[in-house]
């Protein structure tokens, strides 16, 4: 891929009108109605509680049995099973926050698509959720965009363990994992060829349609979970490897603490969130030995990150941050429909970035978006990834979104 050095004055950005108004929230959850006390659904329950406390009109939608209906005047509501009145939704004042489990059934995702088609902002979109739930697809997309990931190959069939190991080009031990799965479930530590073949054959016997991945093992004492909302980093926590295990998931008993990110780690995590189209995601990585200089190993991106352990480690209330950020309606449409061609390029100040080729009017301009823009005395200050650039203001056009 061709790398282009872009100097500061070449930045083009959209200026969004900041607009804070009263808004409404619908929370989509796969939680069974009877499991209110379960830690598995902690975040959806806390979202509902805090929204009510803040005076936000909120509705917890249980995906099983729910549907979207439209009356003769075009008004839309989404009721839970047994709730005839339901919850009124509109793209003008409603956002949908999607929690884990929606990828269990196609009909759940189809309901999300119906909601998206009404113009309602969804956190996250169906596209983002489907990318993140497919670990191999995520790995390919991250690597194609220039991020560093563990070497990963598909295990083609029940007799394909040895072939996959050869393609991996690694030594034992290796990691065998299912292509879907969260919280460290479906991840196995393999120390020999015999062990690999046995595990692969057993898993295929249990499910002939299973998709398995073989991944190089990166020895580490911890990994890091970074919370990203609206392309901004909220905080990061270190998850120490469980004693006697190789996993570092909080749900598996890992000890946790706050983690201070290096500049390159911050940049890579924001890029990972953008690549999967995530409004609110958790980015997991293993730091490089020289984390100030080298890229981290991005492990995966979670489209429904938990908040309990993160708040315990960082003292940051992610749910409160989320509701505050989306109070500003200009943040509702941070994921426009993709068009044109995407490219990775190096900016003189901001470093490696992802730009979108503007295909309108036969243009060959690469467009990037700044986090903040300040215009003063015919100068403009661009803020992106924690860095700032000042340049002369040549021309500005305000574009109202949403």
Regions found by a protein language model. Give the residues of each.
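ATP-binding N-terminal substructure of ATP-dependent carboxylate-amine bond-forming enzymes
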Residues: 2-121
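Active-site nucleotide/adenylate-binding loops and adjacent lid/helix of ATP-dependent enzymes
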Residues: 22-33, 37-44, 48, 90-91, ...
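Protein kinase-like catalytic core scaffold
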Residues: 174, 235, 281, 297-300
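Phosphate-binding site of ATP-dependent enzymes
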Residues: 185-272
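Short, surface-exposed charged micro-motifs
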Residues: 225, 284-286, 356
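A long amphipathic alpha-helix within ATP-dependent nucleotide-binding catalytic cores
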Residues: 246-298, 322-327
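Glycine-rich phosphate/pyrophosphate-binding beta-alpha loops
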Residues: 302-312
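Pepsin/retropepsin-fold aspartyl endopeptidases
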Residues: 333-402
């Amino acid at each position: 891929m061709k790398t282009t050095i872009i100097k500061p004055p070449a930045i083009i950005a959209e200026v969004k009108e900041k607009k804070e108004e009263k808004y409404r929230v619908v929370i989509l959850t796969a939680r069974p109605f009877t499991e209110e006390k379960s830690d598995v659904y902690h975040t959806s329950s806390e979202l509902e509680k805090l929204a009510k406390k803040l005076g936000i009109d909120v509705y917890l939608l249980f995906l099983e049995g729910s549907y979207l209906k439209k009356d003769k005047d075009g008004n839309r509501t989404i009721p839970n099973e047994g709730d005839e009145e339901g919850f009124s939704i509109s793209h003008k004042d409603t956002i949908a926050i999607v929690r884990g489990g929606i990828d269990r059934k196609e009909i759940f995702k189809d309901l999300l698509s119906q909601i998206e088609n009404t113009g309602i902002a969804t956190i996250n979109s169906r596209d983002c959720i489907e990318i993140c739930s497919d670990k191999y697809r995520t790995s390919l997309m991250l690597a194609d965009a220039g991020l560093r990931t563990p070497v990963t190959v598909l295990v083609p069939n029940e007799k394909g363990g040895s072939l996959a190991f050869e393609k991996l080009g690694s030594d034992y031990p290796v990691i065998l994992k299912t292509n879907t799965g969260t919280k460290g479930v479906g991840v196995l530590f393999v120390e020999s060829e015999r062990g690999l073949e046995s595990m692969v054959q057993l898993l295929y016997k249990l499910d002939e349609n299973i998709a398995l991945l073989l991944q190089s093992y990166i020895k580490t004492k911890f990994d890091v979970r970074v919370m990203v909302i609206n392309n901004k980093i909220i905080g990061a926590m270190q998850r120490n490897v469980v004693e006697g295990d190789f996993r570092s998931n909080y749900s598996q008993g890992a000890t946790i603490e706050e983690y201070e990110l290096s500049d390159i780690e911050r940049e890579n995590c924001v890029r990972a969130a953008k690549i999967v189209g995530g409004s609110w995601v958790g980015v997991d990585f293993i730091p490089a030995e020289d984390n100030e200089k080298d890229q981290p190993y991005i492990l995966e991106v979670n489209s429904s990150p938990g908040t309990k352990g993160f708040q315990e480690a960082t003292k940051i209330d992610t749910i409160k941050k989320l509701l505050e950020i989306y109070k500003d309606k200009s943040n509702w449409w941070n994921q426009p429909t993709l068009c044109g061609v995407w490219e990775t390029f190096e900016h003189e100040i901001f470093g490696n970035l992802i730009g979108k080729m503007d295909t309108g009017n036969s243009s060959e301009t690469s467009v990037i978006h700044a986090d903040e823009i300040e215009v003063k005395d015919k100068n403009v200050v661009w803020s992106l990834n924690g860095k700032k650039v000042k340049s002369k203001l040549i021309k500005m056009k305000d574009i109202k979104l949403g």
